[in-house]
């Protein structure tokens, strides 16, 4: 399993604009190898808002299949250009090495 994060710096007070885009079912849920998605808002930032989109995949190839799909291109087309509230973003890939579950789930 891998986790891919997209951490985005957003003008202060506008983090909700990006968060709202993910608060509905989309095409990613239909993709092969997709395991889940979380939207995280960093606490206590001063100069900007920071939103991290964290997705879980069976394998990196599954994530790459998503990024090459027409559904991905449609979702990221930014008609009218990149939103002006986005300052910067960074993509990171993580190999999951250990997963722990609550005791009730482990039994």
From Swiss-Prot:
<dbReference type="Pfam" id="PF03992">
    <property type="entry name" value="ABM"/>
</dbReference>
<feature type="binding site">
    <location>
        <position position="6"/>
    </location>
    <ligand>
        <name>Fe cation</name>
    </ligand>
</feature>
<protein>
    <recommendedName>
        <fullName>Heme-degrading monooxygenase</fullName>
        <ecNumber>1.14.14.18</ecNumber>
    </recommendedName>
</protein>
<dbReference type="InterPro" id="IPR050404">
    <property type="entry name" value="Heme-degrading_MO"/>
</dbReference>
<dbReference type="GO" id="GO:0005506">
    <property type="term" value="F:iron ion binding"/>
</dbReference>
<dbReference type="GO" id="GO:0020037">
    <property type="term" value="F:heme binding"/>
</dbReference>
<feature type="binding site" description="axial binding residue">
    <location>
        <position position="76"/>
    </location>
    <ligand>
        <name>heme</name>
    </ligand>
</feature>
<feature type="domain" description="ABM">
    <location>
        <begin position="2"/>
        <end position="94"/>
    </location>
</feature>
<dbReference type="GO" id="GO:0042167">
    <property type="term" value="P:heme catabolic process"/>
</dbReference>
<keyword id="KW-0408">Iron</keyword>
<dbReference type="InterPro" id="IPR007138">
    <property type="entry name" value="ABM_dom"/>
</dbReference>
<dbReference type="InterPro" id="IPR011008">
    <property type="entry name" value="Dimeric_a/b-barrel"/>
</dbReference>
<dbReference type="GO" id="GO:0004392">
    <property type="term" value="F:heme oxygenase (decyclizing) activity"/>
</dbReference>
<keyword id="KW-0349">Heme</keyword>
<keyword id="KW-0503">Monooxygenase</keyword>
<keyword id="KW-0560">Oxidoreductase</keyword>
<dbReference type="InterPro" id="IPR023953">
    <property type="entry name" value="IsdG"/>
</dbReference>
<comment type="subunit">
    <text>Homodimer.</text>
</comment>
<comment type="similarity">
    <text>Belongs to the antibiotic biosynthesis monooxygenase family. Heme-degrading monooxygenase IsdG subfamily.</text>
</comment>
<dbReference type="GO" id="GO:0033212">
    <property type="term" value="P:iron import into cell"/>
</dbReference>
<feature type="site" description="Transition state stabilizer">
    <location>
        <position position="66"/>
    </location>
</feature>
<comment type="function">
    <text>Allows bacterial pathogens to use the host heme as an iron source. Catalyzes the oxidative degradation of the heme macrocyclic porphyrin ring to the biliverdin in the presence of a suitable electron donor such as ascorbate or NADPH--cytochrome P450 reductase, with subsequent release of free iron.</text>
</comment>
<keyword id="KW-0963">Cytoplasm</keyword>
<dbReference type="GO" id="GO:0005737">
    <property type="term" value="C:cytoplasm"/>
</dbReference>
<keyword id="KW-0479">Metal-binding</keyword>
